[in-house]
């Protein structure tokens, strides 16, 4: 997910005219990086809740923030197709009656029961395990049951995590950009005059 936000920059125009081009770019970079980092944390929390697992379990499926550069003022991260076993979700269990679990959806229809009567646990030689069920009466093939992937949680239109990311990014950048421009003005030894209070 890349940081693309809209904000009213008219109050910054007089400051920007006083700053060096490099100084202004550095101020923007700091504001974007900090805003994107804060928004990513919010997105991680929503993705975890959407899948019904802990944030720690989701983190390996979300890349670290790709920060801005002198030639690229965008910041982004990627939600991957990390597979998380259904048994790692809250309340999931496999017993004589098969799998009893829930889908934890903040997007769309919300949470729902997920019951598979003929599900069983497969234990691997390395100690790993996953829930599976047979697709037919034959011994093979079997199909694994997994929680929602991070890429799904972020990729859907109007996904809760995507909406939260965008909202937080916009709020953070609106706050941080004026602060970083002010810092840059002071570092360049230029006088700082706050914008007029319009009552907004």
PLM feature spans:
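Short, Lys/Arg-rich flexible segments
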Residues: 1-200
């Amino acid at each position: 997910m890349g940081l693309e936000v809209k904000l009213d920059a008219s109050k910054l125009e007089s400051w920007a005219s006083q700053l060096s081009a490099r100084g202004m770019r550095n101020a923007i970079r700091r504001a974007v990086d900090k805003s994107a980092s804060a928004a990513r944390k919010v997105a991680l929390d929503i993705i975890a809740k959407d899948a019904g697992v802990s944030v720690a379990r989701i983190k390996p499926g979300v890349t670290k923030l790709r920060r801005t550069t002198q030639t690229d003022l965008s910041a982004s991260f990627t939600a991957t197709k990390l597979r998380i076993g259904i048994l790692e979700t809250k309340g999931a269990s496999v017993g004589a009656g098969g799998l009893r679990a829930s889908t934890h959806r903040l997007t769309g229809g919300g949470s729902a029961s997920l019951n598979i009567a003929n599900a069983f646990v497969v234990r691997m030689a390395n100690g790993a395990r996953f829930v599976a069920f047979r697709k037919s009466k034959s011994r093979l093939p079997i199909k694994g049951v997994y929680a929602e992937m991070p890429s799904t949680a972020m990729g859907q239109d109007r996904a809760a995590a995507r909406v939260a990311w965008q909202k937080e990014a916009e709020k953070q950048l609106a706050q941080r950009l004026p602060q970083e421009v002010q810092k840059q003005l002071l570092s360049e030894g230029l006088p700082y005059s706050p914008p007029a209070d319009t009552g907004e």
